[in-house]
Each structure stands twice: as structure tokens, then as C-alpha cells.
């Protein structure tokens, strides 16, 4: 087991897909820490539109400008992943008051599982506060334009998913 390091933060999520809101959070977190690990969760129970490998690749591309940010996929308990990364901080985004109850429960559970790790909440810039991966997926599934919410590579990946489902 690694010792928790407050200079290393883990930002976990399914990132299905990564959005401009996620990117904004990483852009603001990167200067605060020596190392930020974006942990892309496998989460098969959520029925992701994109494979874990594709989500990791899209996040790596979107965050490539940051030398201190790394993207890793994981399929373990978050507490185990955080310990494996040696992180002392768990980053979570809060878009709206509606996110708070769930995030508070998760932070409390994580405090029991990994008491040496602090949860830090960041809010996105106002222009990203309404963006969610699930809304982006739904808009894309129905043929809407998601280019204002995600990087161009994600727009293309979602277009490919829609096209392959239409052919199935």
C-alpha cells in the first residue's frame, strides 16, 4: 500500500464521454497538484456507449496539454485505485445543488474506506454547469449537435457509435 500524498489527486469518473465540463475541472485542478490522475472507471453496470479503451484514449487526447495529468482506466473499487495511485486527494465535480447529496454520500463512504484521503469538490465554470455525459450521449443518440459540449474527437466517436447502432 502506498502512502497518501496530498500532492497527488485522483479525479474518477466513467467519462462516457469526457465533456468540456470535465476538461474545465482538470484545467483548474492541474495547477493545484503535482500530479492529477484521471481515473476512467470500467463501470459495465452503467452500460457505457464507449469502451473503456476508447474513453481512456479520448480523455488522454483531450488532456494532453497537461504534463502532470495522466489518464488511467480501472476496474477495481475506487478506494483501491486511489491507494494504488498513492493519492491523498479525491477530486469530485459539483455542477449543481442536485449533485451534492449523492457526492456527500460518496465522500462519507470514501472517508470510511480511505480515511487518509480527503475529498475536494470543485465546481465547473458557469458555462459548463449544465453539461453531463448522460445528456451528451442522449443528444448524440438522437442525432443532435453536441459540438458545443465535447471536444471534436468525442463528437466523431459518438457519431461512429450512432452509425454502428443504426447499421445493427
UniProtKB/Swiss-Prot annotation:
Cellular localization per UniProt: Cytoplasm
UniProt EC number: 2.7.7.3
Residues engaged in binding substrate: 14, 46, 78, 92
Keywords: ATP-binding, Coenzyme A biosynthesis, Cytoplasm, Magnesium, Nucleotide-binding, Nucleotidyltransferase, Transferase
GO terms of molecular function: ATP binding; pantetheine-phosphate adenylyltransferase activity
Residues at the site labelled Transition state stabilizer: 22
Functional note: Reversibly transfers an adenylyl group from ATP to 4'-phosphopantetheine, yielding dephospho-CoA (dPCoA) and pyrophosphate.
Family annotation (HAMAP family): PPAT_bact
Cross-referenced PANTHER family: PHOSPHOPANTETHEINE ADENYLYLTRANSFERASE (PTHR21342:SF1)
Name this protein carries in UniProt: Phosphopantetheine adenylyltransferase
Amino acid at each position: 500500500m502506498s502512502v497518501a500524498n496530498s500532492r497527488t489527486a485522483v479525479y474518477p469518473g466513467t467519462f462516457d464521454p469526457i465533456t468540456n465540463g470535465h476538461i474545465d475541472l482538470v484545467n483548474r485542478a492541474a495547477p493545484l497538484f503535482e500530479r492529477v490522475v484521471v481515473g476512467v472507471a470500467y463501470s459495465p453496470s452503467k452500460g457505457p456507449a464507449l469502451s473503456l479503451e476508447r474513453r481512456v484514449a479520448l480523455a488522454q487526447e483531450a488532456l494532453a496539454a497537461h504534463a502532470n495529468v495522466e489518464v488511467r482506466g480501472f476496474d477495481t473499487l475506487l478506494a483501491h485505485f486511489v491507494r494504488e495511485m498513492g493519492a491523498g486527494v479525491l477530486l469530485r465535480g459539483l455542477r449543481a445543488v442536485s449533485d451534492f447529496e449523492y457526492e456527500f454520500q460518496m465522500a462519507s463512504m470514501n472517508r470510511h474506506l480511505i480515511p487518509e484521503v480527503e475529498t475536494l469538490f470543485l465546481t465547473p465554470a458557469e458555462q459548463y454547469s449544465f453539461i453531463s455525459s448522460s445528456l451528451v450521449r442522449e443528444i448524440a443518440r438522437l442525432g443532435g449537435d453536441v459540438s458545443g459540449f465535447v471536444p471534436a474527437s468525442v463528437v466523431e466517436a459518438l457519431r461512429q457509435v450512432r452509425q454502428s447502432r443504426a447499421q445493427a
